[in-house]
Amino acid sequence: HYKGYFPINHHGGGNMDRKKVLEWFQDILKTDSTKIFHNAMYDVAWIRALGLKINGRIVDTMIAAAVTDENRFRYDLNSLSWKYNGYGKSEAGLSEAAAEWGIDPKSEMYKLPSLNVGAYAERDAEATFGLWQHMKREIIEQDLDAVFNLETDLFPCLVDMRFKGVRVDVEGAQKLKKTLI
C-alpha cells in the first residue's frame, strides 16, 4: 500500500500543480481497485465536488466498525485506531503549527503550509488502512459479510441522494405516521 499527501489548496504555500495532481488522482480513482476510507461520505463528497469520478468498491471503515460492534460509543478514526492498531492519529505537529499560525487545526488546516499537514494526512491514511486489515477479519469472524456488503453496495446510492436530494411525499408520510402511531 502507498500513502502520500498531495497538497493543492494550502494558503500557507507548498502546493503542487493542481491540474496535474487531479489528473493523476482521477487516473487512480478510475481503476476498479477497492478504495478504503474512514467516514467515506466526507471524502467522497469532496472528491465528487472536485468533479472526479470513483470506480471500484468503496469501503468505509467507520461502517465496518459499526457493523462489527454496534454498541461502541465512538467510531472516530483516532479511537478505533488506538483500539485496533495500537496507535492514534498524529495530531501533535498539526496542533503546534496551528498554534503558531493562530488558527484552528481542524477547520482551518488549509491555511497552514502543506509541510505542516503532510504527516498528519499520511498517518490518517496509514491508520485507515491498518483499521481495514482488522475490520475485514472481524467481519468474516462474526459472519457479517452479507450485512457489510449490503451497506457497502448501498453507499453509492446514498452519495447520489446526498448530492441530488430525495423527493418526499409529505402528505403520504403524514398518513403513514398516523397509521403507525
Which residue stretches match the model-derived regions?
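Active-site-proximal helix-loop-helix substrate-binding element of RNase H-like nuclease domains
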Residues: 2-140, 150, 158
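Extended, well-ordered alpha-helical scaffold/bundle regions in very large, multi-domain proteins
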Residues: 146-181
